Amino acid sequence: KKLRALSKGEKPFCLAVGFFKPHLPFTAPRKYWDLYDENAIPLSPVPNIPEGICRYALHNSGEFNGYLEGDERASLDKSVSEVYARKLRHAYFACISYIDAQVGKIIDELERLGEADNTIIVVWGDHGWHLGDQRVWGKHTLMETSLRSTLIMKVPHSSKSIENHRIVSSIDIYPTLMELCGVSVPDGLDGHSFTKLLADPKERS
């Protein structure tokens, strides 16, 4: 509804849409659970605590354990069972698929309105999440699993699909959008535009 109203205006628009999932608790409509065979879901490839690591870099999954409906409790001293780990990962995957479908609805509406080819789309997450990695179920660690987040951008008139592994930060999104929109970037920003990386992954932002 909001997109339809904005598309009728003569000025460029910016719409921010926030989705709560896949935040705890891991709940999603049944049809998204049914997309997966729980027995085929892989476990974490790095389930154990790295040797010699300072445990202050990790935690005992307090937020996760705070949800009383959980069947088991996670801790650094003992992993949850493989059966329960698969159940949890299944739930997380279902939440991701649910949100993926919601993002799809927005893109479908942009296409229906004829705005898709003139709209920059950013899918952005604020943190990663341990799914049993290093025995943690949650965020708030110093591990890459927690610190790395989702960032997907679709820029009009770009036919390339590029996967880029260079490091950027959330504070770089604003100056990037400003440059893409042809707007002067204010002085004194902490972030830097990474528009060059959108065209060539070998470039340095």
Say what each PLM segment does.
Residues 2-11, 16-167, 180-188:
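Active-site-proximal cap/lid insertion segments
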Residues 193, 197-205:
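Short, intrinsically disordered, charge-balanced linker/junction segments flanking boundaries
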Residues 170, 174:
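Zinc-coordinating Cys/His ligand positions in small cysteine/histidine-rich zinc-finger domains
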